[in-house]
Amino acid sequence: VESDKNGDDLISDILSAIEKKGDVDDTKVKRHSAYLNLEKQMREQIEALQAACTASLGNTPNDKTFVATFIFDDVEPQGVEDSTLKLYGLSNRPFKPNQLNLARIFTKLPNVAWIGDTPLDSDEIEQSLMSAAFSGALYAPHMIDKFPLYTHRINAVKMGVRITDQHKVRLGAYLGEGTTLMPGASYVNFNAGTDGAMIEGRISSSAFVGKGSDIGGGASILGTLSGGNSIPITVGRNCLLEVNCALGI
C-alpha cells in the first residue's frame, strides 16, 4: 500500500487493502498475528504511523513514499518490503527464530552502505563520494551490509535488553527480556536469539539460547548458514558454554 507523504489517506488506504482480502480466514490471520488485535491495535498502530508521517514532513524528500506491507501467507520473501517486515516480526518478538520462512532472503535485500540509519545504494554512494571530494566533507558509512542494525530499528530499552555495541546485533535477531550482550566477541545474527541469556560469544542464524544461560567469551554456536550444518541448535536454560568453545552438529 502506498500513500502520499502527508499520510492523509494512509488509514483508509490500508484498511481498504485489508478489506480486499475478504476471502482470508480472519481466525487464521489472528492466530499468526496474535500480538495484534485487528480491530483496535492495528488501527492504533496505523494512526501512530500517520502521525509519524505528518511529523516528518520537513525532513522527508518529495520523491519518497511510505509503503505498508502485509503478509497473509508465509512464503519465502518476495522483495525488500516483506523481507524487512519478517525481520521486524522477529526482533519485536511476536515470532521466534525458525518460525518464519526466510529462504533466500539474502537475494532479496540489496547490499548498501549505511550512514546512520540511512541506506545508500551504489548510485547514491557515487554521488556522496563526488560531493565529499568537491566539498571537503567526509563520506563515512559505518557499515556495508544488507541488514539494518537492531538498535536502529527496535526500542531496546523497552524490550528490556542490554547491548554494549550496536554493531553486534542485526535486525531480525530475537532478544528476550534480560538478554545482555557484553563487549568483545558477542554477536547475534538475524533469525537467531535468546530468551534472556548472557552473551559473550556468537549466536549464528537459526541458533537459540534459553533463559539464564551464559555463552562464554569467544564461544560460537553454529547456525544453518554455516557449511555442513543444517540442523538448528537450541541451548537450554541455565547452561554454560565455556570460553572459546564451539557448538555444532
PLM region descriptions:
Residues 156-249:
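Structural signal for interior beta-strand "rungs" in well-ordered beta-sheet cores
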Residues 1-154:
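Terminal amphipathic alpha-helical/low-complexity segments used for targeting or macromolecular assembly
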